[in-house]
């Protein structure tokens, strides 16, 4: 497969995952804003920081972190290349470039998503309509994901797409935890004790892990358990451990298909071995913020190495 085609499949999947992750962040911010009007603007800024969009937002709107302005910026602002509308278009453009490597079902799902969400976000989304709009974004992404896993051959094209998905997801989870890490520190909440219900629920809901956490831990809420669940629990599809294992798995499949070991493959193996083998208490003892910063640095370096090894840009 040409590097350009592999890169298009990889970025198609990354952009689709990014649009869904941002929709979940907006939903979490919206829930907090409904219950805590006195701190709503601080929470909306936190959403922008997590999504990596705060700098661009402040350039355009200064310190006005009102709900409607932030939501509109993240959903549909044409001047924001990371808005959901923008990344859906980029996903569709990449899918079109690699169209001959996609099944008809995958292409139609991506194209339908672009048309449906383009129509939905053509106008400003009112506050009362926001939950339905965010649900539609998640639903469209689910249809693409279903078509991808249900109809694609398990060849290099599939593995490049999955690699993009899980690298993007790992980056997103680590950013959420890094922005919110102060909530999990002993200075704010005793390790093993309870922390603010609205805030921890926001963390879990923003990664679709609220109900799964309840199934596993019941009503017991603690900083240590939340961090352990989202970092080390390998059965959770949005934990760092799960994402890293999938990255290593799909890179391994690509390497076997090409009969060639790469630096990216070695880096992925090291990421799983070095970053996910310590127990959660050791991670806290060493500094949660430092751990997450190191993880983000490692995944960023891995993503850049993937692009070099497989010549996404000639």
Please annotate each region the language model reported.
Residues 1-314:
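Alpha-helical transmembrane segments and their helix-helix packing motifs
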């Amino acid at each position: 497969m040409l590097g350009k085609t592999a890169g298009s499949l990889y970025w198609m999947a990354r952009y689709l995952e990014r649009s869904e992750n941002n929709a979940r962040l907006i939903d979490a911010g919206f829930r907090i804003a409904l219950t805590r009007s006195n701190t709503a603007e601080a929470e909306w800024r936190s959403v922008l920081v997590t999504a990596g969009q705060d700098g661009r937002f402040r350039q355009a709107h200064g310190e006005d972190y009102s709900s409607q302005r932030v939501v509109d910026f993240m959903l549909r602002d044409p001047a924001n290349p990371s808005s959901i509308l923008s990344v859906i278009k980029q996903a569709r453009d990449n899918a079109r470039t690699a169209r001959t490597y996609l099944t008809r079902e995958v292409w139609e799902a991506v194209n339908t998503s672009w048309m449906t969400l383009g129509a939905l976000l053509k106008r400003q989304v009112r506050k009362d309509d926001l939950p339905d709009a965010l649900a539609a974004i998640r639903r469209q992404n689910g249809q693409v994901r279903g078509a991808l896993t249900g109809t694609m051959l398990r060849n290099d094209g599939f593995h490049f797409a999955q690699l993009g998905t899980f690298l993007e997801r790992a980056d997103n989870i680590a950013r959420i935890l890094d922005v919110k890490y102060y909530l999990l520190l002993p200075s704010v909440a005793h390790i093993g004790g309870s922390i603010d219900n609205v805030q921890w629920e926001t963390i879990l809901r923003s990664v679709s892990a609220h109900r799964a956490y309840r199934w596993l831990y019941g009503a017991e809420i603690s900083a240590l358990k939340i961090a352990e669940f989202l970092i080390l629990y390998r059965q959770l599809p949005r934990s760092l451990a799960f994402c890293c294992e999938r990255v290593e798995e799909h890179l391994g499949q690509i390497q076997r298909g090409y009969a060639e070991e790469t630096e990216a493959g070695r880096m992925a193996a090291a990421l799983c071995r070095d970053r996910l083998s310590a127990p959660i208490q050791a991670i806290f003892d060493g500094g949660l913020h430092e751990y997450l910063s190191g993880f983000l640095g490692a995944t960023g370096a891995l993503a850049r190495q993937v692009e070099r090894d497989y010549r996404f840009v000639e």
